[in-house]
C-alpha cells in the first residue's frame, strides 16, 4: 500500500498487481512501492515470478490485474517503457557490432540522450580498451558488463534489474553495487531480483519476497 505519510508519491507503486499464465497464478496480488533514492530487493525461489514481475513492470507483458502508478498516476504501457530501463537475463546485444557500436546503436534506437559518452561508460564498467572488440568475441561476464554500460547510459529514473549479479565475479558484483548506489544518490530507484546470498545492494534497501504459486 502507498504510505499516506509520504509528502510526495512514490516513484513507482503497484496496487493489487497479479499475473497468471495458462490460467495458473504466477504472482500476486501484490501491493508495493519504491521511492526515489531507494532499492527494492525482490527475492523468492525459482518459479516465484520474479522475472515475470519485472517484465510486467517494464511493459514487456500485459498487466492482467491491478494497477501500476508512476509518480502517483496510472501508467500506460508506453509510459513505463520510457520511464524504466530493463536489464534481463539476455543482454540484447548485436553480436557482430563492436562494444562501442552497440552503445551508439542502442542510444540512437531508443532516441535517448545519453547522460555520459559511451566511451566513458565502457571505462566505468571495466571495458576500457575493448572499444573495437566484437560482442561475439566477449566472455559472458564481459557481455554482462557491456549491458551494464548500456544501463548506465540510460536517463531512465527506474532501473529494473533481473539477476544483475549473474555471470559476474566479485569485482563485477562490487561494480553493480556501486552503480546502483550512484543511481540512487542521483535520485533514481531500482528493483533488483536475486536469490544470491551475496547480493545486497547498499544504501536504502527494502525487501519484497515472492512465494511460488501452489
Swiss-Prot record:
Gene3D superfamilies referenced in this protein's UniProt entry, alphabetically: P-loop containing nucleotide triphosphate hydrolases (3.40.50.300)
GO molecular function: ABC-type heme transporter activity; ATP binding; ATP hydrolysis activity
GO annotation (BP), single: cytochrome complex assembly
Membrane disposition: Peripheral membrane protein
Matching SUPFAM superfamilies: P-loop containing nucleoside triphosphate hydrolases (SSF52540)
One Pfam family hit: ABC_tran
Cellular localisation: Cell inner membrane
Catalytic activity: heme b(in) + ATP + H2O = heme b(out) + ADP + phosphate + H(+)
EC number: 7.6.2.5
GO cellular component terms, A-Z: plasma membrane
UniProt domain ABC transporter: residue ranges: 12-214
Superkingdom assignment: Bacteria
First and last residue of the signal peptide: none
Residues binding ATP: 44-51
The keyword Nucleotide-binding is annotated on this UniProt entry: yes
Broadest EC class assigned to this enzyme: translocase
Primary site of residence: membrane
Summary of the function given for this chain in its UniProt record: Part of the ABC transporter complex CcmAB involved in the biogenesis of c-type cytochromes; once thought to export heme, this seems not to be the case, but its exact role is uncertain. Responsible for energy coupling to the transport system.
NCBIfam families, A to Z: ccmA (TIGR01189), PRK13538.1 (NF010061)
Similarity-based family: Belongs to the ABC transporter superfamily. CcmA exporter (TC 3.A.1.107) family.
Protein name (Swiss-Prot/TrEMBL): Cytochrome c biogenesis ATP-binding export protein CcmA
Source organism (scientific name): Xanthomonas campestris pv. campestris (strain ATCC 33913 / DSM 3586 / NCPPB 528 / LMG 568 / P 25)
Amino acid at each position: 500500500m502507498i504510505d499516506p505519510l509520504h509528502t510526495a508519491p512514490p516513484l513507482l507503486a503497484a496496487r493489487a498487481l497479479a499475473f497468471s499464465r495458462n490460467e495458473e497464478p504466477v504472482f500476486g496480488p501484490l501491493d508495493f512501492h519504491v521511492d526515489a533514492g531507494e532499492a527494492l530487493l525482490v527475492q523468492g525461489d525459482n518459479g516465484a515470478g520474479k522475472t515475470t514481475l519485472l517484465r510486467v513492470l517494464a511493459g514487456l507483458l500485459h498487466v492482467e490485474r491491478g494497477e501500476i502508478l508512476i509518480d502517483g498516476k496510472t501508467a500506460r504501457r508506453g509510459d513505463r517503457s520510457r520511464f524504466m530501463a530493463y536489464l534481463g537475463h539476455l543482454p540484447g546485444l548485436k553480436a557482430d557490432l563492436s562494444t562501442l557500436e552497440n552503445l551508439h546503436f542502442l542510444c540512437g534506437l531508443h532516441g535517448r540522450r545519453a547522460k555520459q559518452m559511451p566511451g566513458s561508460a565502457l571505462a566505468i564498467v571495466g571495458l576500457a580498451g575493448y572499444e573495437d572488440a566484437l560482442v561475439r568475441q566477449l566472455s559472458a561476464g564481459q557481455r554482462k558488463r557491456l549491458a551494464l554500460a548500456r544501463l548506465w547510459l540510460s536517463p531512465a529514473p527506474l532501473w529494473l534489474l533481473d539477476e544483475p549479479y549473474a555471470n559476474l565475479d566479485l569485482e563485477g558484483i562490487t561494480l553493480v553495487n556501486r552503480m546502483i548506489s550512484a543511481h540512487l544518490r542521483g535520485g533514481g530507484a531500482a528493483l533488483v531480483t536475486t536469490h544470491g546470498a551475496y547480493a545486497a545492494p547498499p544504501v536504502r534497501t527494502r525487501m519484497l519476497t515472492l512465494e511460488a504459486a501452489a
